[in-house]
C-alpha cells in the first residue's frame, strides 16, 4: 500500500459502528439521551457554581472548569458520531481529522492536569485546614486553572505536531472519531523514533498526574485516619470520595487507551472504551458530584424550590 497523500484534498473514512448495522439505531438513541443528560448536568453545575454564594470556593471553582471541559470534551466527538450513525457519509477531511485529534487531546490533557489540581485542593483542605484559605488564594486558583489549560494544549500541540510529521498508509480509520491510537495504526514507518517521543508525551500527561494524585490521597487517607470526629471523617470521605471516583474513571480508561503499545491496541475494543470516556464519564461526573455532595444538592434543591414557587 502506498503512502497516503496528506494534502488538503486527502481525507479519511470513519468506520464507526458500521460493522454492526443492526445496532446503529440503538446506539443513536442511547447516545443522544446520554449526550442530552451530559449537557444538562454539566451546564447545571457551572450555573450553580456561579450563582450560589455558598459554592464560591476553590473546590467548586475547579469543578466548574471540569464541567466545562466535559461539555467541550463530549461535544468534540458526539455530534459527528450521531451524524455518522444517522446518515451514510462517514468521511472527514484531513484537516478536520487533525483538528479533532488536537482538540480532543488538548481537552483530555487539560482535564488530566486539572484533576491533579483538584487533588491538591483536597489535600490542602484535609491536611492543612488551618491554612487552607491562605494556600488556596483566589489568585493561585486562577493561576492553577490557567496552567492546566496551557499545559494541556501544549502537550496536545507537541503530540499532534509529531503525528503530522509521520507518513501514513491508508485512509480507513476503524473508529467513530479521529483519535491518536487509531491514527498511529496508519503509520507506514517510524522515522527518527517519533512514536517513542509521542509515548513519552502521553506518559507525562497520564502517568505522572496519576502518581501525583495517588500520593496526595495517601496523605489525605493518613490525615483522615487521625481525625477523631466521625462527622468530620464522613465529610472528608464524601468530598474526596467523589473526586477519587471521577479520577478512577478518567485515568483507568486513559491508561488502557494511551499507554499500551500500538501493536497490542485493539481498534474494536478501543471503540467501546472510547464510548465510555467520551460519553459515559462526562455524563456520570455531574451525578457523582451532586449525589455525594450536600452543598451541591442543597444549591440544586434551592433552585428547584424557587422554580416551584414561581411556577
Swiss-Prot record:
State the disulfide connectivity.
97-188
Keyword line = Cell membrane, Disulfide bond, G-protein coupled receptor, Glycoprotein, Membrane, Olfaction, Receptor, Sensory transduction, Transducer, Transmembrane, Transmembrane helix
Q: Where are the transmembrane segments?
A: 26-46, 58-78, 100-120, 134-154, 198-218, 236-256, 271-291
Instruction: Show the GO cellular component annotation of the record.
Output: membrane; plasma membrane
Q: Where in the cell is it found?
A: Cell membrane
Q: Which terms does the UniProt entry file under GO BP?
A: G protein-coupled receptor signaling pathway; sensory perception of smell
Taken from the record's topology, the Extracellular segments are 1-25, 79-99, 155-197, 257-270
Q: Which domain of life is it from?
A: Eukaryota
What membrane topology does the annotation report for this chain? Multi-pass membrane protein
- InterPro entries named among the record's database cross-references: GPCR_Rhodpsn (IPR000276), GPCR_Rhodpsn_7TM (IPR017452), Olfact_rcpt (IPR000725)
Cytoplasmic-facing ranges: 47-57, 121-133, 219-235, 292-311
- What is its biological role? Odorant receptor.
Family membership: Belongs to the G-protein coupled receptor 1 family.
What name appears for this protein in its UniProt entry?
A: Olfactory receptor 2Y1B
Q: Which organism is it from?
A: Mus musculus
Recall the taxonomic lineage recorded for the source organism: Eukaryota, Metazoa, Chordata, Craniata, Vertebrata
Amino acid at each position: 500500500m502506498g503512502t497516503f497523500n496528506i494534502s488538503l484534498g486527502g481525507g479519511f473514512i470513519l468506520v464507526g459502528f458500521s460493522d454492526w448495522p443492526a445496532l446503529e439505531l440503538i446506539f443513536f438513541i442511547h447516545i443522544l439521551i446520554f449526550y442530552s443528560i451530559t449537557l444538562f448536568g454539566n451546564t447545571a453545575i457551572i450555573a450553580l457554581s456561579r450563582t450560589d454564594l455558598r459554592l464560591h470556593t476553590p473546590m467548586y471553582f475547579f469543578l466548574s472548569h471540569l464541567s466545562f471541559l466535559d461539555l467541550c470534551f463530549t461535544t468534540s466527538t458526539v455530534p459527528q458520531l450521531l451524524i455518522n450513525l444517522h446518515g451514510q457519509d462517514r468521511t472527514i477531511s484531513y484537516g478536520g481529522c487533525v483538528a479533532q485529534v488536537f482538540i480532543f487531546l488538548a481537552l483530555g490533557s487539560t482535564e488530566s492536569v486539572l484533576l491533579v489540581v483538584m487533588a491538591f485542593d483536597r489535600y490542602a483542605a484535609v491536611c492543612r485546614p488551618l491554612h487552607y484559605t491562605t494556600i488556596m488564594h483566589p489568585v493561585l486558583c486562577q493561576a492553577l486553572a490557567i496552567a492546566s489549560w496551557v499545559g494541556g494544549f501544549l502537550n496536545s500541540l507537541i503530540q499532534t505536531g509529531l503525528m503530522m510529521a509521520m507518513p501514513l498508509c491508508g485512509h480507513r480509520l476503524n473508529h467513530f472519531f479521529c483519535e491518536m491510537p487509531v491514527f498511529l495504526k496508519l503509520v507506514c514507518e517510524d522515522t527518527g523514533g517519533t512514536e517513542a517521543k509521542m509515548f513519552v508525551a502521553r506518559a507525562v500527561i497520564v502517568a505522572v498526574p496519576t502518581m501525583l494524585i495517588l500520593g496526595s490521597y495517601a496523605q489525605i487517607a493518613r490525615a483522615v485516619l487521625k481525625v477523631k470526629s466521625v462527622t468530620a471523617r464522613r465529610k472528608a470521605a464524601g468530598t474526596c470520595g467523589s473526586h477519587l471516583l471521577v479520577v478512577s474513571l478518567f485515568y483507568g480508561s486513559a491508561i488502557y487507551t494511551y499507554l499500551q503499545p500500538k501493536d497490542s491496541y485493539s481498534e474494536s475494543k478501543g471503540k467501546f472504551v472510547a464510548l465510555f470516556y467520551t460519553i459515559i464519564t462526562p455524563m456520570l461526573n455531574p451525578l457523582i458530584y451532586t449525589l455525594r455532595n450536600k452543598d451541591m444538592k442543597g444549591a440544586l434543591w434551592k433552585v428547584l424550590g424557587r422554580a416551584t414557587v414561581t411556577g
